[in-house]
């Protein structure tokens, strides 16, 4: 259970309040993070989203995680997706498309950190004959994210 990744997903709108009990509460307990707040979060029903949000914010405070903006959330997510690409848990094209979506969610025209992934994903759609090349470029960029952004 990676609370920082959960926070990043939540900030980007990729982790809904309804999923917090399972994704943060239950998984946190399974990972050995045994706090009263996590226990309470883990037993909430999906329709208790306001309470789930409040408890998640409290958990972030308990673990001393500062608030993050969408750009930093996207960077955290990019490291995670890059690791999954390199471990073959996610195809290069799927990973690049997810990061393209994350970049859109940042909603900042000056945010260009994920542009290599975005370019490759967009070109994959229009140049199917160059799939190997673009997959290779996505893997290279994933390596950079894992090595230089950890």
Descriptions of predicted regions:
Residues 1-150:
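Acidic, Ser/Pro/Thr-rich low-complexity regulatory regions
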């Amino acid at each position: 259970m990676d609370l920082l990744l959960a926070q990043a997903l939540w900030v980007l709108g990729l982790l809904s309040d309804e999923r917090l009990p399972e994704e943060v509460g239950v998984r946190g307990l399974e990972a050995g993070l045994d706090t009263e707040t996590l226990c309470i979060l883990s037993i909430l029903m999906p329709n208790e989203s306001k309470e789930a949000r409040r408890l998640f914010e409290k958990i972030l405070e308990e673990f001393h995680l500062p608030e993050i903006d969408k750009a930093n959330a996207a960077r955290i997510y990019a490291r995670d997706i890059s690791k999954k690409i390199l471990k073959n848990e996610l195809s290069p094209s799927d990973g690049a498309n997810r990061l393209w979506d994350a970049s859109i969610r940042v909603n900042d025209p000056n945010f260009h950190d994920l542009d290599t992934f975005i370019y490759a994903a967009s070109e994959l759609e229009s140049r199917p004959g160059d799939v190997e090349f673009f997959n290779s470029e996505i893997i290279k960029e994933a390596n950079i994210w894992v090595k230089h952004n950890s």
